[in-house]
Design a protein with these regions (language model features):
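HotDog/MaoC-like acyl-thioester-processing domains
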Residues: 524-534, 613, 617-670
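N-terminal Rossmann-like NAD(P)+-binding subdomain of aldehyde/semialdehyde dehydrogenases
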Residues: 1-136, 321
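Catalytic strand-loop segment that frames the active site of acyl-thioester-processing enzymes
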Residues: 521-581, 667
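Rossmann-like NAD(P) dinucleotide-binding subdomain of oxidoreductase/dehydrogenase enzymes
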Residues: 118-277, 404, 457
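Hydrophobic beta-strand-centered segment that forms part of the acyl-chain substrate-binding groove
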Residues: 572-581, 585-630
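ALDH superfamily catalytic-core signature
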Residues: 196-201, 227, 235-384, 404-408, ...
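Short, well-ordered beta-strand elements within core beta-sheets of diverse protein domains
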Residues: 30-37, 53-57, 131-132, 152-153, ...
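Conserved C-terminal structural/oligomerization subdomain of aldehyde/semialdehyde dehydrogenase
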Residues: 26-33, 200-205, 224-225, 306, ...
Length: 670
């Protein structure tokens, strides 16, 4: 008998006398006892705020990203222990891959994005500096900093590992401690993964805590610096969202709810063609994976009226071949629902759907003691007059075919559910894809457009990717999670800071034009990453650009554009006073002015960003460069990236060009 424990204030707490007995969905026998312990939720929040939050916020974004990478690697090394428990939830090995490997992969992804896309500091910069005064002495900048409370994560039963890790990763990267509350039915698998997290020793005390069982008065104790992220049913979300304490303190509440997701077969998809076959294959996958218990599963299959019979026959034949039984048996394609209560709920909702739709296949169950149900396909002859098919979700291996007249009608039907997490379109016609997108994008959190070109690399209709947002409008909850760094920002406060360039530079750890320049003891290209200071600047001598320079560059490169070679034609151009120097010639001369050629800590020039030209340079003009260290970002164990602001001015002091130069610089001297 499994006895998953809560983890609060650094201590494991066993189930209490009122623990709930969990009946196995496969064996129909008791497999675990969970909950019932008297947890002190006030103490848990205090522990998170006093210990976990300060420890996490003391780390830079990159340090937290490295922590996540190490944790993901630790979990990956022990994942077979989780796969051993996985069948108890009713899930097959294939189902478990989505949950276990998918969750670990999500953590790896956030670790990588944190290193690549966030600064190696404590303040996230959101957007460009805004000049608020005429002379540049008063500026504005949007920043984001971690919330100083705790994140409460209330997760669903269907993905006990992924559901936890996909919320933990962005919150911990943001620097916010978390209290995890898994669904009781599958909490033993969540607890096994959570126990590994604690055993890794990689997170600071108070960074994560676990609630097995009821949340008691936890939500009543939250404040404006806290956040709630919920995944589950629309009914439960409505109940939680209405908590008076959450409303009173405007506590952030993100909800990802079940939704009646649609898949559209394009009018160009002929029976037996690639797009038709892809539609059928993905529909079968969505109906059967996790026994249909996915918030992103296809529930409404919208097909042209002329293709309805072809699709019905193809799907019915494929679904009839699906083997249903003990998920530990590799021969079984589909396992059980997560509980007998979940199966009963599906059967109840299926009965209500049958008032508007006919059963084409399924609506039966294997002769087994567990919570099994055969995949079921319905068809609704008049989806315009129907309401249940657009409102009632049977959260299991059930989908309904809906015939449509044309593309506009298909989009109308897809939108009829009041908002969804994802809608799919199977077409090779770009015009159809654009029409459906314009008609439907506002109603769905994600549009998955599939055809023969994308299929070899596609991840599937029902797979939320950590790079992309997961959420949707209306019935889907109106929230978002994941989406790369967007998901991290849900746990941060965006603040507008205003002040002088020096103040903003100090806050953001980034040199801002107008802030103080620093003069180093020698050329910065001869100094290591650690030695270079933010704001360190050199001013180069000037170089005169001659007509011979321009003509030689034109012949040498082949760039004989008339503005460089034909004075009369150039004067007819509203941008040029006559022949002018090539922009790339100016960049080359600039490099010649500021580069220190001897071997040193600078390893490579790896990029150039935000290049712009403000004023043409004519023969006889001179240019000089101001090169300033703008920011520094650690990249590997041996070198980091230094971003330089390069500003080119002419003999009159007027700016002619500006760009950001990226160099990789060694931490130490060779």
């Amino acid at each position: 008998m499994l006895k998953p424990e809560s983890y609060a204030c650094g201590q494991w707490i066993a189930p209490g006398a009122d623990a709930q007995t969990i009946i196995g969905p496969v064996s129909a026998q008791p497999i675990a006892q969970a909950g019932g312990a008297a947890l002190d939720f006030g103490a848990m929040l205090d522990w998170a705020r006093a210990h976990g939050g300060p420890a996490l916020r003391a780390m830079t974004f990159h340090q937290r990203a490295k922590m996540l990478k190490a944790l993901a690697g630790y979990l990956d090394a022990r994942k077979e222990e989780l796969y051993a428990i996985n069948p108890l939830t009713g899930a097959t090995r294939r189902d478990g891959w989505v949950d276990i490997d998918g969750g670990i992969g999500t953590m790896f992804l956030f670790a990588a994005k944190g290193r690549r896309e966030m600064p190696d500091g404590h303040v996230y910069i959101d957007g460009e500096v805004e000049q608020l005064g005429r002379k540049g002495g008063f500026l504005g900048q949007h920043i984001a900093v971690p919330l100083q409370g705790a994140a409460v994560h209330i997760n669903a039963f269907n993905f006990p590992v992924w559901g936890m890790l996909e919320k933990l990763a962005p919150a911990l990267l943001a620097g916010v401690p978390c209290i995890v509350k898994p669904a009781t039915q599958t909490c033993y698998l969540t607890e096994a993964c959570f126990r590994m997290i604690i055993e890794s020793g990689l997170l600071p005390d108070g960074a994560v805590q676990l609630v097995i069982g009821r949340t008691g008065d936890l939500l009543d104790r939250l404040g404006a610096q806290d956040a709630v992220a919920f995944t589950g049913s629309a009914d439960t979300a409505l109940l939680l969202r209405g908590n008076q304490n959450l409303l009173r303190h405007s506590v952030r509440f993100t909800s990802e709810q079940d939704s009646l997701n649609a898949a559209i077969l394009g009018p160009d998809a002929d029976a037996g063609g690639p797009e038709f076959d892809l539609f059928v294959t993905e529909a079968v996958t969505e109906i059967t994976t996790k026994a249909g218990q996915k918030c992103t599963a296809m529930r409404r299959l919208i097909v042209p009226q002329a293709r309805l019979d072809d699709v019905a026959q193809a799907l019915s034949a494929r679904l009839a071949e699906v083997t249903v039984g003990d998920p530990a048996d590799a021969a079984m394609r589909m396992g059980a629902l997560a509980s007998h209560a979940a199966r009963d709920d599906v059967l109840d909702r299926l009965a209500r759907l049958k008032a508007e739709a006919r059963v084409l296949c399924g609506d039966t169950a294997p002769d087994l003691p567990g919570a099994f149900l055969n995949p079921t396909l319905l068809t609704c002859d008049d989806p315009d007059a129907a309401s249940a098919v657009h409102e009632i979700e049977a959260f299991g291996p059930v989908a309904t075919l809906l015939p449509c007249r044309d593309t506009a009608h298909a989009a109308q039907l897809a939108n009829a559910s009041g908002g969804s997490l994802v809608a799919s379109l199977f077409t090779k016609d770009a015009g159809v894809a654009r029409d459906v997108t314009l008609a439907s994008a506002a109603h769905h959190g994600r549009l998955y457009i599939m055809n023969r070109t994308a299929a070899p690399e596609a991840t599937g209709h029902g797979s939320p990717l950590p790079h992309m947002i997961h959420g949707g409008p209306g019935r889907a909850g109106g929230g978002e999670e994941l989406g790369g760094i967007r998901g991290v920002l849900h746990y941060m406060q965006r603040t507008a800071i205003q002040g002088s360039p020096d103040m903003l530079s100090a806050i953001t750890e980034t040199w801002i034009k107008g802030s103080a320049e620093v003069t180093g003891p020698d050329h910065p290209f001869q100094r290591t990453f650690r030695e270079i200071a933010i704001g360190e600047t050199i001013h180069t001598p000037a170089r005169t650009v001659t007509l011979e320079d321009i003509e030689h560059f034109a012949r040498f490169t082949g760039d004989t554009f008339y503005a460089h070679m034909d004075d009369e034609a150039a004067r007819a151009n509203p941008f040029f006073p006559g022949r002018v120097a090539h922009g790339y010639l100016l960049l080359s001369f600039a490099a010649g002015l500021f580069v220190q050629p001897d071997p040193g800590p600078v390893l490579a020039n790896t990029g150039l960003n935000a290049l712009s030209f403000q004023k043409p340079v004519s023969p006889g003009d001179s240019i000089a460069v101001r090169l300033t260290c703008k920011r520094k970002t650690a990249r590997t164990d041996s070198y980091g990236e230094v971003a330089w602001n390069a500003t080119l001015t002419n003999q009159e002091g007027a700016q002619v060009a500006e760009y950001e130069l990226l160099t990789m610089v060694a931490y130490d001297r060779a």
